[in-house]
């Protein structure tokens, strides 16, 4: 692994880490977050007719004068760099993002069925919820203590709606199991 060994010098540790096979593999989250990685991942997956799929999308960028996207001032600080890099993508539709993921990538796999989410969950199809504007990737988990835009009540309401969705999804899948 990448953990420094007890008797290993810091320079030896850096050297070993730099030459790790991890950097040559595509089996990691960093690769999955790239367009090529997401495309590869989507090709390998299919929809299960018995599973409820729902996506939650955020965006926290704004257009610049030259048509790129720039991180909003309230974006989680560590994600402003990646947000700005994504915002310079060659293809315009890939620029709007939440600091880690492009909006277009977070909605649904291109090769699979999708629909706009409603109050009624469905199985076997991606249900795309409306994009949450001025939300960054961290807002979904409430870990940005410096965020002055999201209120505690707003986050709690979001999490309660997720819990309600999970209960509804469980009922939907349980009903099918009972009928089988």
Description of each model-found segment:
Residues 1-180:
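Helical cap/lid subdomain of alpha/beta-hydrolase-fold lipid enzymes
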């Amino acid at each position: 692994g990448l953990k420094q060994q007890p008797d290993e010098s810091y320079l030896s540790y850096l050297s070993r880490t730099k030459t790790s096979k991890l950097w040559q593999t595509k089996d990691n989250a960093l690769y999955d977050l790239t367009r090529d990685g997401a495309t590869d991942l989507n090709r390998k997956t299919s929809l299960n007719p018995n599973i409820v799929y729902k996506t939650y999308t955020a965006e926290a960028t704004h257009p610049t004068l030259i048509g790129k996207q720039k991180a909003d001032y309230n974006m989680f600080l560590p994600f402003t760099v990646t947000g700005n890099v994504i915002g310079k993508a060659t293809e315009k539709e890939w620029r709007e993002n939440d600091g880690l993921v492009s909006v277009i990538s977070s909605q649904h796999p291109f090769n699979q069925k999708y629909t706009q989410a409603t109050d009624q969950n469905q199985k076997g199809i991606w249900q795309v919820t409306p994009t949450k504007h001025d939300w960054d990737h961290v807002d979904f988990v409430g870990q940005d203590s410096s965020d002055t835009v999201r209120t505690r009540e707003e986050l709690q309401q979001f999490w309660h709606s997720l819990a309600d969705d999970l209960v509804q999804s469980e009922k939907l899948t349980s009903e099918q199991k009972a009928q089988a």
